[in-house]
Regions:
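Catalytic core of pol beta-like nucleotidyltransferases
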Residues: 1-27, 35-41, 54-102
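Short hydrophobic/aromatic beta-strand micro-patches
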Residues: 31, 48-50
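A short, structured beta-strand/loop element
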Residues: 42-43, 47
Length: 102
């Protein structure tokens, strides 16, 4: 993948907002090297979602398909997880550095 600035990356990710919301997401965030501005050419794209557990649990199979679609569109590996699944020892730093997409 060519290096893409954060604004361009966020614009592409926002095109998936409806699909993510239809599958239970209430927010989408970039974290990791692309959020802090130090990606390497081989860096993946780390994303986490928020969801309202009382209204709808994310359809993980559909999220995996969205993850695959994004990987193809961007030309890099994409990993989508939930905020609740973030590692407890790293969660505070991840949340601090995360960039909200939607």
């Amino acid at each position: 993948m060519r290096f893409m600035n954060q604004a361009a990356l966020i614009e592409i990710l926002r095109t998936y907002d409806t699909a993510l919301r239809e599958n239970g997401a209430t927010g989408l965030f970039i974290f990791g090297s692309r959020a802090v501005g130090v990606p390497r050419p081989d860096s993946d794209l780390d994303l986490f979602i928020d969801y309202d557990p009382e209204s709808k649990v994310p359809n993980m199979f559909r999220l995996m398909q969205i993850e695959e679609d994004l990987s193809k569109a961007l030309g890099i590996p994409v990993i989508i997880t939930t905020r609740n699944a973030l590692h407890p020892l790293m969660k505070e730093n991840i949340e601090r550095d995360a960039i909200r997409v939607s």
